[in-house]
Amino acid sequence: MKWIAPALAYLAVGLGILQFHSAWGALVGFHIVIIISLLIARPNIPLAVLLKNTKRKWIVLSILLCGSSGVALYLLWDTFGFPNDLPAQVKALGLTSSTWIPFIAYFALVNPWIEEYFWRGYLGSETKMLHVSDLVYSGFHALVMIGKVQTGSILFGLSMLVLAGWFWRQIAHENRGLLAPVLGHMMADFTILVAVYLNV
């Protein structure tokens, strides 16, 4: 079950984006699949680990480093080769003037808790080397990026996400908790989505 769960998460995102053309459907479906998988697996990881942190410096570093990702995306927007019809593509996914703000709020405030418990908690590892969970975490984002940026930008984005997964996994191990990764993930999600919102 442990490694079936990511496959089901990929399926949920793929169906939401590619079949039903719904950003909300992809995100909520992704979360439902993860939560059901965790309820079935019943990992011996207390939810309190999401609030655990032993060294404040990791929170600060995680927030600053990950928050800079959206700032960099905004400042370097033109270098990533976004198509001229990106606003239309985004609108076709159901993200309009009335739904963007709630989507950003839900994505930034809810998603990091679910993802960090799943990827760095349930599927995580204490190895300092790259782990398969880093790669699998990165990979599903390709389903969101395909058709919206050039191939080179997709590969760059996936590489950065592998590093982000590895980084969050390391600070989770150092802190014996997931609060620093959650807050960094939260800042990354928020700033990246705001950068997209401001450009479409």
Cite the ranges covered by each PLM segment:
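Non-cytosolic membrane-interface motifs at loop->transmembrane helix junctions
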Residues: G25-F30, P87-G94, T151-M160
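A residue-identity detector for tryptophan
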Residues: W3, Y10, W24, W58, ...
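Alpha-helical transmembrane spans of integral membrane proteins, capturing the lipid-embedded, hydrophobic core
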Residues: W3, A7, L11, H31, ...
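N-terminal, membrane-interfacial amphipathic/helix-forming hydrophobic leader that caps
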Residues: M1-R56, V71, F190-V200
